Each structure stands twice: as C-alpha cells, then as structure tokens.
Amino acid sequence: MKLNTIAPAEGSKKDRRRVGRGIGSGFGKTAGRGHKGQHARSGGYHKVGFEGGQMPLQRRIPKRGFRNTLGVRVVEVALSQLESAAIDGVVDLEGLLLRRIVRGSPDAVKVILTGEITQGLTVRGLRVSAGARAAIEKAGGKVED
C-alpha cells in the first residue's frame, strides 16, 4: 500500500449535487425549485423563526428571570480545602486561585464549615462563616479581615 494509492471506500463519498446543469442530471432547468412562486425566486424565502403569521415560538413562551447587575458572586470554599491552598501558613484569594480551588474571578470567597482543619492557618481577605471561624481558631489559626 502506498499513500498515492489510498482511496475512500466505494460508496462512502457522495458527489455534491450540481443543480441547473442540464435536463439529464435530474436537477436541470428549474434546479429542484419547481415552477414560479416565492420559493422559486432568488432573494430568500422567509425570516428565521417565521411561522406563516402564527405567533412564533420565541414569542409564545414567557420571559424568565433577569440578570442582576448588582449581584455579588460569592464562591463557597470548604474548610477542608484550606490546607491545600495555604502558602506559608496563609490562605488568601491568590492561593485559592493558584491551586485551582476557586476559578474565574469571583466577587467574594466565603469559607464554610465543611470538613475539618488540623493546621493553624491565617485566613486573610476572605469571608468566613461563624462555625468556620470557630474551627480555624480552635486549630490554632486566626482570621484577618
């Protein structure tokens, strides 16, 4: 077998339909468009979503929700994830982003009481729930706002 002899399997490729190229082709003369009428003319048929005067689907279905421009996107981080995000005993947004615990650009990060913590860590610049704050301080750490 050589590269110049490789060919696709018989019947696996279908030729493009070349319309308007003679009566013998089966798609000559009117090129599969029939005789006269809106469909036969150039310049399009109807706009996308047009349903012949019936109320279109995108207008029949009610609107839902809104995008809150004043909303604050808070990402929750479990207490058990803090130890892996600590850099020199300090946990901050930079460390969480670096370790891929938090992705994107959240408006705020909140530490919640899920799991447990064994090391005394300093949590800096993050929101902390009351339960998580107590657990951090119990482990010998501190929370700096």
From Swiss-Prot:
Compositional bias per record (Gly residues), positions renumbered to this chain: 21-31
GO cellular component terms, semicolon-separated: cytosolic large ribosomal subunit
Pfam family, one: Ribosomal_L27A
GO molecular function: rRNA binding; structural constituent of ribosome
InterPro entries noted in UniProt: Ribosomal_uL15 (IPR030878), Ribosomal_uL15/eL18 (IPR021131), Ribosomal_uL15/eL18_sf (IPR036227), Ribosomal_uL15_bac-type (IPR005749), Ribosomal_uL15_CS (IPR001196)
Record's keyword terms, sorted: Ribonucleoprotein, Ribosomal protein, RNA-binding, rRNA-binding
Region Disordered: start-end pairs: 1-52
Gene3D superfamilies: 3.100.10.10
Highest rank taxon of the organism: Bacteria
Gene Ontology biological process terms, A to Z: translation
Protein family per UniProt: Belongs to the universal ribosomal protein uL15 family.
Subunit field text: Part of the 50S ribosomal subunit.
Function according to Swiss-Prot or TrEMBL: Binds to the 23S rRNA.
Protein name: Large ribosomal subunit protein uL15
Source organism per UniProt: Acidithiobacillus ferrooxidans (strain ATCC 23270 / DSM 14882 / CIP 104768 / NCIMB 8455) (Ferrobacillus ferrooxidans (strain ATCC 23270))
Gene behind the chain: rplO
